[in-house]
Design a protein with these regions (language model features):
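N-terminal low-complexity, acidic/polar interaction/targeting segments
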Residues: 1-203
Length: 203
């Protein structure tokens, strides 16, 4: 097992995904400084209950999902508002064995890193999902800064398409987390088909 700092967020990030974050809480500024000095990373985990920011001493840490993604900082800058901006890239999934409150109220976790999913081409019956992903990227999902940062997507691979679609679809995070925890990228595409169909029917 490994001990890593955890960053609870109301979102799901897969390995290979990139995310821009604005850092303003002291505990996370300290964490980012330490990660950059040690060339280490931290875990992003989805919030199940509770708040992301801690504004009072009495406020409890949020409860989080047991599966997350270990990330590393790939870029940073000082924003116009004076806050630190960072771009992180997901590296590998992990499962949390235990988590607790550390120094500066930073959430720490004892985690086990998981094996990477197998690569598999997109079956013909799911090929249209790659087109949908392209449409989402053009109209919604990835900022110019993230595109410029070198985010690469293989539209022929089930893993890449399923991961990026899950991150970008406008659906509840609990559904995204279920897709995230799946181990078979082709099976994930099948579940995405069902989810998209339900979303279309509910319009």
């Amino acid at each position: 097992m490994s001990e890593i700092p955890l960053f609870p967020l109301p979102l799901v990030l897969f390995p290979g995904g990139r995310l821009e974050l604005q850092i303003f809480e002291v505990r996370y500024l300290d964490m980012v400084t330490r990660c950059m000095q040690e060339e280490s990373g931290f875990g992003i985990v989805m919030i199940e209950h509770g708040e992301q920011a801690l504004t009072t001493r009495e406020q409890q840490l949020p409860s989080v999902s047991h599966y997350g993604t270990y990330c590393k900082i790939v870029d940073f800058d000082q924003r116009g508002n004076g806050m630190l901006g960072i771009t992180v890239e997901g590296q590998v999934k992990f499962v949390i064995r235990d988590y607790y409150e550390g120094e500066n109220r930073l959430m720490m976790g004892d985690v086990r890193f998981l094996e990477k999913e197998n690569l598999a081409p997109i079956p013909d019956k799911h090929a249209h999902l790659a087109n949908l992903l392209g449409t989402l990227i053009d109209h919604k999902g990835i900022s110019k800064a993230l595109k410029d940062s070198g985010l690469e997507i293989d539209f022929a691979q089930a893993l890449d398409v399923g991961a990026r679609l899950t991150e970008l679809l406008p659906c509840p995070n609990r559904y995204k987390q279920r897709l995230f925890e799946m181990k078979d990228p082709v099976a994930r595409l099948g579940e995405l088909e069902k989810l998209i169909e339900r979303m279309q029917q509910s319009k």
